[in-house]
Regions:
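Glycine-rich helix-loop-beta junction characteristic of Rossmann-like nucleotide cofactor-binding loops
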Residues: 1-4, 176-177
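The start of beta-strands in P-loop NTPase/AAA+ ATPase cores
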Residues: 6, 30, 182-184
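Class I S-adenosyl-L-methionine-dependent methyltransferase module
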Residues: 26-167, 171
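Short, motif-level signal for alpha-helix interfacial/capping segments enriched in acidic residues
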Residues: 12-14, 147-148
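Short, well-ordered alpha-helical microsegments
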Residues: 17-20, 41, 173-175
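Active-site segment flanking the S-adenosylmethionine/decSAM binding pocket
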Residues: 164-185
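Conserved SAM-binding loop of SAM-dependent methyltransferases across substrates and taxa
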Residues: 16-28
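Conserved class I S-adenosyl-L-methionine
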Residues: 6-13, 32
């Protein structure tokens, strides 16, 4: 049961967001979704802010095979987005290229940095859906057409429109947001 009045609703351990999605949006309060799992927080971020790119990355002809599951699981387990050298690459491009060429290279570098998050989100979504019990460790051996989720993803994007997505340890999150008028769930 929710309190009668609060200024901010904060899901400390957001997980699948069942409570957030189960409650009606409230214009009177700020909503914060948090999960320590960076893949899950990234998935929610991409569903909220990059919906079209996320759906495009999911693809329209999914394979849903054990081989695809293994490739996706390996991608999620081993590959993190690497933007460590983005600033350095942009500085070098600006220094050595003429302005029109620099702008084109800058656009490509920034798009590639952003797309990594979308690719990771799409891979994680498929890993969840294709795995046994959504555990992300073993193939579920059941047919699943990712296209059946497209409408739900659009609905989730609209529901998350005014929600802050965080990826913090619960203690850091509570320290940051703790106020008398907040409701932590």
């Amino acid at each position: 049961m929710f309190p009668a009045s609060y200024d901010r609703y904060i899901e400390v351990f957001g997980g699948g967001g069942w409570v957030l999605f189960g409650k009606p949006p409230d214009d009177r309060c700020m909503e914060i979704y948090n999960d320590y799992n960076s893949n899950l927080a990234n998935l929610f971020y991409c569903v909220k802010n990059r919906t079209g790119a996320f759906l495009k990355e999911l693809g329209f002809l999914p394979l849903n095979s054990r081989d695809e599951f293994t490739v996706i699981r390996n991608f999620i387990e081993k590959q993190e987005p690497d933007t460590r050298f983005l600033i350095e690459e942009l500085e070098l491009a600006e220094k050595h290229l003429m302005p029109p060429d620099y702008e084109e290279v800058k656009k490509i570098l920034l798009e590639n940095a952003e797309v990594t998050d979308v690719k990771r989100a799409a891979a994680f979504f498929k890993l969840i859906r294709y795995s046994y019990g959504s555990g992300c460790t073993s193939f579920g051996c059941r047919p699943f057409d990712v296209r059946n989720c497209f409408d739900t993803i659009w609905q989730a994007s609209r529901r998350l429109a005014d929600t802050v997505i965080e990826n913090k340890d619960f203690e850091a999150l509570i320290r940051q947001y703790d106020r008398d008028s907040d409701f932590f769930y």
